[in-house]
């Protein structure tokens, strides 16, 4: 095809393969190559990937909150708030890995949080390839001007030039689906953006302009602190399209020791190990509006009530605290998501977790930390967002099948078992689910309450194959301190042969007589114990019954295997051991 002043050809792509966001389909891309030839013989050639998609949006009659449609299909928004590195020194590979990890977490969009700035092209290119939608907040927004510095605004010509360049930089990316005026308030110069800049530089209507992050069909405001897991199911903010839901997300011990001052010698009264370094890295109590209690001490209270205070006030005690924090992470992140699941499409049309990542070493608000480690809550979060999911609703003790495939699912069987700590069966139930419609599908029974500590194992079979399983520790008063007294579990690993795509299958078996909790796998170098990051696992922090065997896969290792590769396995009640390749 050739364009000349006399021949402005129309570009027609017959029956194109559509670009779909993750969970709805494949993000098909095309490449357009343009070459400009001047009469003097000079030429310039440039290639641009692009995708073909259609975006629509409306307010749900059921929730009165926003719903997005891509290529004619409703999209339940599963998002995260993304922030840039504090020193702006990430490599291109790191930006790409941030996107890949988001898709692996079952997210279909990321919000580039307003004050964080404008990421490089690598970030958007990866989002195009992975099918991760992006919301781009504009700079110099409500937070960056009027809220934090009343009366401040950059010169108009500077703002206009910066905003123009942002629009031109990102407008060709199919992953871009939202422009947003800014964080928690309209942009002070919204009229310039919507009246001049967007109509001039992005007039094609392939994305939507959102006035503010918590307006125009979205809501925000947390909760930003950890709640007891059951309370998420009745919290009024766990509804609508919530743009910021934020449990704490304490990182793993291996990350904590990177930035804490050890040994800890002084700490807040009755709150070991919380000292000034913890506070500096965001473990603070701060006020919040509308009854919001942004207090890290509330998370610490939950750890101490549910799992017990650290056993000692030395480094061993810190490791004990970190292990108990992972138990809390696991139940908290799952509860927040399963509370949304319980109202899927009826009261909820989407969410964005606060936050997806961290811009520096932090002890809260993250599912992937600054070192690219995923804590236990990252995996329970991911599990709760699987296409077909079975869950226990903590508020009314019902069991439900969640279907987010977009189509009815048939030939489903739900199995539920309750055990005491000695693995004695206390209750069993099977039910065939005729057809699980998109959304939440309660079963016909509830799980009876039992005295003391018990374990609930749920399985969902589709065509005879287990497609979802879930494991809960339950106690009427939420006192789980007895977990610390569980006998050590023996877990065996069997490494398979690397497949053509580089994926390595790993079979994990509980060979003990009791449950194995939060079984964690790490790729390490055997002689040094140094962990290889990032390393993507299809699942991790496993909870296994006696004799239970699962297969997970290790894949996505950008740096390649370490010199002497090995897998370390450990868990809350699983002594660490190493299996070499």
At which residue positions do the language-model features occur?
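Short, flexible, glycine/charge-rich loop motifs used to bind or transfer phosphoryl groups or to couple energy/partner
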Residues: 20, 100, 167-169, 229-232, ...
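Long, contiguous hydrophobic alpha-helical segments, chiefly transmembrane helices and signal peptides
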Residues: 19, 52-55, 77-82, 102, ...
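A generic secondary-structure signal
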Residues: 101, 165-169, 197-200, 335-343, ...
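Active-site-adjacent substrate/metal-binding segments within catalytic domains
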Residues: 16-19, 41-143, 152-178, 282, ...
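Substrate-binding/catalytic cleft of secreted carbohydrate-active enzymes
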Residues: 109-288, 328, 332, 348, ...
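Secreted/periplasmic carbohydrate-active enzymes, especially glycoside hydrolases
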Residues: 1-111, 118, 344-348, 373, ...
